[in-house]
Amino acid sequence: MSKETKLQVEAIKNGTVIDHIPAKVGIKVLKLFDMHNSTQRVTIGLNLPSSALGSKDLLKIENVFISEAQASKLALYAPHATVNQIENYEVVKKLALQLPERINNVFACPNSNCISHNEPVESSFKLSEKNNDIRLKCKYCEKVFARDVVTEIEA
């Protein structure tokens, strides 16, 4: 007996679809863009089956279009995610995610002795990637941290 089943998430008319987010990262992305406080409808798929990733997260945000700058921040969490802008149920633009060279005023430095904690300065990290391993170097204390160490502080 062969029974075909297909999981579906409702299509959105206008907005942004972020697909291929690594599993367990979708909630962090929601918080990064403050979407958990949005008045717009947000559809969240967590731990969905994925042939490429094994499992993945998916976000659909109605009537919200993320910018190229926001897409760069997203690349820090999900460098291989796809971001589609939807208008009238059609994909009108695909944003290519590119890891930014530097990220400012998003995360605090994990080094408690860093001057960025006691001085009125914006946090600033230089980003680098090698073999899918993302590292952040603090502009002030010059310590290098794994992505997970820096991003877990705010999440």
From Swiss-Prot:
Zn(2+) binds at C109, C114, C138, C141. GO terms for molecular function: metal ion binding. Its cofactor is Zn(2+). Binds 1 zinc ion per subunit. The keyword Secreted does not apply. It comes from the Bacteria. Keywords: Metal-binding, Pyrimidine biosynthesis, Zinc. One of its GO terms (cellular component) is aspartate carbamoyltransferase complex. SUPFAM superfamilies: Aspartate carbamoyltransferase, Regulatory-chain, C-terminal domain, Aspartate carbamoyltransferase, Regulatory-chain, N-terminal domain. GO terms for biological process: 'de novo' pyrimidine nucleobase biosynthetic process; pyrimidine nucleotide biosynthetic process. InterPro entries: Asp_carbamoyltransf_reg_N, Asp_carbamoylTrfase_reg, Asp_carbamoyltrfase_reg_C, Asp_carbatrfase_reg_C_sf, Asp_carbatrfase_reg_N_sf. Gene3D superfamilies: Aspartate carbamoyltransferase regulatory subunit, C-terminal domain, Aspartate carbamoyltransferase regulatory subunit, N-terminal domain. Transmembrane segments: none annotated. It holds the Pfam family PyrI. Involved in allosteric regulation of aspartate carbamoyltransferase. HAMAP family: Asp_carb_tr_reg (MF_00002). Contains catalytic and regulatory chains. Belongs to the PyrI family. This is Aspartate carbamoyltransferase regulatory chain. It comes from Vibrio cholerae serotype O1 (strain ATCC 39541 / Classical Ogawa 395 / O395). The lineage of its organism: Bacteria, Pseudomonadati, Pseudomonadota, Gammaproteobacteria, Vibrionales. The gene is pyrI.
